[in-house]
Amino acid sequence: MSALRLIVGLGNPGQEHAQTRHNAGFRFVDSLIERSGARWALDSKLFGETAKVDIAGQPVWLLKPATFMNLSGKSITAALRFWKIEPEHLLVAHDELDLAPGTARLKFDGGHGGQNGLRDTIGLLGHGKFHRLRVGIGHPGHKDRVVPWVLGRAGREDDAAIGTAIDAAIDVLPLAMEGHFSEAMKRLHTSRDA
């Protein structure tokens, strides 16, 4: 695997969405910003906020699309074109209904699994050959409750578990940055914290 050059967190912009389950991807990249001391800057040509940080001595761009979840691909593809980055150097962090809170999983390639930000990105790229960080938010139990679930806030216990999973993912990120994605996956997937 090639080293990562762009990490995108999916979510919805605006204070009213800031603490929702759907914004787990935003939460991941915000945690990277907090650890690095960098700051977000609005970049209208990329339809989102951007920052450049170093992880394991490697420079990497961070992106938070301001397009709302369902149109995330517009921002992601603009950034890939502008920075001349191939999709295999991309990691997209997003919420995952099919994983329990406290669980995070890395993967490469695949479909969208019903996640609309991934659906839009895959549709615009024409393929799913990029890396993903799936941050578990749990499932409400019935498909009719999914929309209010993802747009709602997690309870205290689930919120803490999501934070722990994000921390575990950040801990293995240096391996992924160096091109050791399989090793990063192995460590994250066998971690007791994720």
UniProtKB/Swiss-Prot annotation:
Catalytic function, reaction form: an N-acyl-L-alpha-aminoacyl-tRNA + H2O = an N-acyl-L-amino acid + a tRNA + H(+)
The gene coding this protein: pth
GO terms for biological process, alphabetical: protein quality control for misfolded or incompletely synthesized proteins; rescue of stalled ribosome
GO molecular function: peptidyl-tRNA hydrolase activity; tRNA binding
Organism: Xanthomonas oryzae pv. oryzae (strain KACC10331 / KXO85)
This protein's GO CC annotations: cytoplasm
Chief subcellular location: cytoplasm
Xref: InterPro entries: Pept_tRNA_hydro (IPR001328), Pept_tRNA_hydro_CS (IPR018171), Pept_tRNA_hydro_sf (IPR036416)
Domain of life: Bacteria
Classification lineage: Bacteria, Pseudomonadati, Pseudomonadota, Gammaproteobacteria, Lysobacterales
Keyword Cytoplasm: yes
Residues at the catalytic site: H22
Pfam families: Pept_tRNA_hydro
Residues at which tRNA binds: H17, F68, N70, N116
Site (Stabilizes the basic form of H active site to accept a proton): D95
Site (Discriminates between blocked and unblocked aminoacyl-tRNA): N12
Compartment(s): Cytoplasm
CDD domains: PTH
Family recorded in the similarity comment: Belongs to the PTH family.
First-level EC class: hydrolase
Keywords carried by this UniProt record: Cytoplasm, Hydrolase, RNA-binding, tRNA-binding
Job of this protein: Hydrolyzes ribosome-free peptidyl-tRNAs (with 1 or more amino acids incorporated), which drop off the ribosome during protein synthesis, or as a result of ribosome stalling. Catalyzes the release of premature peptidyl moieties from peptidyl-tRNA molecules trapped in stalled 50S ribosomal subunits, and thus maintains levels of free tRNAs and 50S ribosomes.
HAMAP family membership: Pept_tRNA_hydro_bact
Positions in coiled-coil regions: none
Assembly description: Monomer.
Protein name according to UniProt: Peptidyl-tRNA hydrolase
Keyword RNA-binding recorded: yes
